[in-house]
Amino acid sequence: MSDYKDTLNLPKTSFSMKGNLANKEPMILNKWEKQGIYKKIREHFAGREKFVLHDGPPYANGSIHVGHAVNKILKDIIIKSKTLSGYDAPFTPTWDCHGLPIELQVEKKHGKAGQSISEDDFRKECRKYAKKQVEIQKKDFKRLGVLGDWEQPYLTMNFDYEANMIRTLAKIIENGHLSKGFKPVHWCTDCGSALAEAEVEYADKISPAIDVKFKIKDKDKLAQAFGLDSLNHDAFAIIWTTTPWTLPANQAIAVNNQLNYSLIKIEDFYIILAENLVEQTLKRYAIENAQIIATTTGDKLTGIIAEHPFYSRHVPILHGDHVTDDSGTGLVHTAPTHGVDDFTLGKEHNLSMEIFVKGNGCYSENTKLFAGEFIFKANDRIIELLGEKKRLMNSDKIKHSYPHCWRHKTPLMFRATPQWFISMEKQGLRNKALQAIKETSWAPSWGQARIEGMVKDRPDWCISRQRTWGVPLPLFIHKETEELHPNTIEILHKVAEKIEKGGIEAWFNADDCEFITETAQYKSVKDTLDVWFDSGSSSMCILDLDKRLSYPADLYLEGSDQHRGWFQTSLLVAMSAKGSQPYKEVFTHGFVVDEHGRKMSKSLGNVTSPQDIYNTLGADILRLWTASTDYKSEMAVSDQILKRTADTYRRLRNTARFLLSNLDGFNPATDIIEFDKLVKLDQWAIAKTKEFQDKIIEAYDKYQTHTVAQLIHHFCSIEMGSFYLDIIKDRQYTAKTDGHPRKSAQTAIYHIVHALVRWMAPILSFTADEIWDATPKTTDLPIQLCEWYTGLKSFDQDAELDLEYWAKIQEIRSEVNRVLEIKRNEDVVKASLEAEITIYADKDNYKLLEKLGNELRFLLISSKADLKVIEESTSSSIAANIPGLSIEITKIEEPKCERCWHRSSTVGDNPQYKDICSRCVENITTEAGESREFA
């Protein structure tokens, strides 16, 4: 037996079978660094239509987690796909660098600002810490294969950014949106500062729920209100509250004029409850022998005076629109300094706004009985005192949703303090923002309703904070009237110039006289700006000023929590400073959870870190998982899920390797065959690739990365792996090296590889770079500078063997393979090349198959295939799952060709080549080799 190995076209490529990504990717990154690849992209696409995806700044504190990785990878995929579409799509990373988390880290090492360390040195340490964190996170983002202007990122602590924030504030003030107010705001006792809406998260909390008796001072007036002559016992207005600690600040009781109220006799006293709540409230009190004496409307009760339950203080009953009879008692305890509705009612009726609680959460010295106590700890003492005073009607516990600090996870309080606000009403900001939301494209579409609801209901934006590490609110107010300095805008621009040279420290270290001359009349505000103002100003500080970018951004892409965060603050800053929305389109992705849908938590032990993934599996596996997951909802990840992703990756890599290995010796400059002259199956492969490319580009344009991933996988495993590549192996390996059949397949493979590597490039950035290096090409451009492949062709409309035709052939082939599997299990044949396949077909199917002539066997990967009419089918044939078709498979008895392994009666016909078939002899000995028309 001769050795025909040297006569075969064995596959050969530099593209390895194993990815070994964890080791290879850093080398590829190093290559990109040396090439200056991002700079080259910018130069190559300069002058093209821009596409700007504006990066929402992550916070510069700690290593990135998998949520950060998902966000940056999705952005990178979109940017790279837009580059392939020919856009100039720059990506400038940003970081959020001021605020409390950084202060807390610095405090751990150096102590509190102004105590163990000077405020100036504290800020220097904060700046140093933030810079270090940026470098740590930057390294991780780059390791993920994310391309961007990493050398010139935007940091909110950059001097020019800090200065431009002040200029943005000046525009907002100039446009009349700033207001000063004494209002209740969410206050964190741990932060020692007011919080913005975006910094508040709701969590379940168990609180005391008590019903408190307020004794009515004038019983005769109450009797009159209920249409009675007199009352012979004491009467009490009953309020229900879950915040006993606010009772020292109580100044009134609110009822609703439109509601009905009942006077109820219980033993030797009366109580007042909303009529609709009587039954459930008495049930809660476990009182059965109560008697409803009379009913009246809320407006008859207003003006009646009650007595505070433990202070000598008159408490009026007042009308409040916010009062309902859905729960509680229908009478609402009102502490003007501890609630928005309470505050509004207090302002309306000129109630006392005395402050009873300090910023640290302890009662102030003027709080009788409880001075110095921490408010939440005082709840029990207050309940105990109410019991002693016979003013406690009922005491219980309730589990309810309660506002917490997003950083400390501790309960918040509403606390009225003097603060600076961006008014939602003064210049119609709320309505303008709502209109801008309507003019923006939101995906998923429910995002629009979500942010609309938030903007409709949100209070004025409290932009002042009482922090050390933050951009100043550099205002000057009159010492007596507290009015803003008349030259505020001019002063702010002067401050901005100073900050641009020396950072925020230039303001904090300066004397007032450096900015104003009237220091006897005016004083500087010592507050800092809310950090959400920092990130919210990015459209003004970056997009509006950087000529490499554009305003508004084409796209904002962040987690779904940003409807209440960055999407909203960006909108409010842009609308109040510039009068237009900062984005055209807003996309959101879900949170990353484990395979059981649980949040990542160290305590649960279910944290998957991006560092672990790229150090073991490789960044491309993380990128493929990200792209493959429908990110509009929660994104589940685990070791098992990543293992499945790695399996998918291997299939994609193997497909690429097979394609590349069959391009050995192919020179695109000289070997490409025109479409019309290709073997018909190769024409199909190119047309099918074109069909998939159109779908893939459409999916990329819609940011549907999971659809892209599904299409690429289907293309590689089904259209290529299970059909085309399976069929052409014989032709590729055994045909004449430079003969038409092989060059035809190589031409198709060349086009397929050039399309496929571009489809993969946004997602599998490292692998695509590897594929590109191993691909024959006529360009020196790196893959990152390429656009979608234009060498593909579709069938003409009048093509006889079009995509529809080949789809039917694929169906028939699948049925043949099904029957083959049956015969394998029956030990009739071991492999398809041992099979003699007879297809019995009705008229329509016969017409389809006869076009392939004697090349049908190549499509079925068998040594012999016969086509007969259905009427000739035998009892041993098996009916196909296609009407009008049955299949018979028997073992072929002819000898095996030692070169192509086909069974053929022609083996040994040539005495010089006794162990190979005539087809192989032709491919070895003739100049042209065999000919193929269809497969």
Curated annotation (Swiss-Prot):
Tell me which cofactor or cofactors this protein depends on: Zn(2+)
> Organism's domain of life?
Bacteria
Provide the protein's localization.
Cytoplasm
Q: What is its EC number?
A: 6.1.1.5
Annotated ATP binding lies at: K602
Q: Which GO terms describe its cellular component?
A: cytosol
* Cofactor remark from the record: Binds 1 zinc ion per subunit.
Membrane-traversing stretches: none
Recall the GO molecular function terms of this protein's record.
aminoacyl-tRNA deacylase activity; ATP binding; isoleucine-tRNA ligase activity; tRNA binding; zinc ion binding
Catalytic activity entry: tRNA(Ile) + L-isoleucine + ATP = L-isoleucyl-tRNA(Ile) + AMP + diphosphate
Major enzyme class: ligase
The answer on whether this UniProt entry bears the keyword ATP-binding reads yes
Motif, 'HIGH' region: chain positions:
58-68
On subunit structure and binding partners, the annotation says:
Monomer.
- The protein's name is Isoleucine--tRNA ligase
Origin species = Francisella tularensis subsp. novicida (strain U112)
Q: What is the lineage of its organism?
A: Bacteria, Pseudomonadati, Pseudomonadota, Gammaproteobacteria, Thiotrichales
Gene giving rise to this polypeptide: ileS
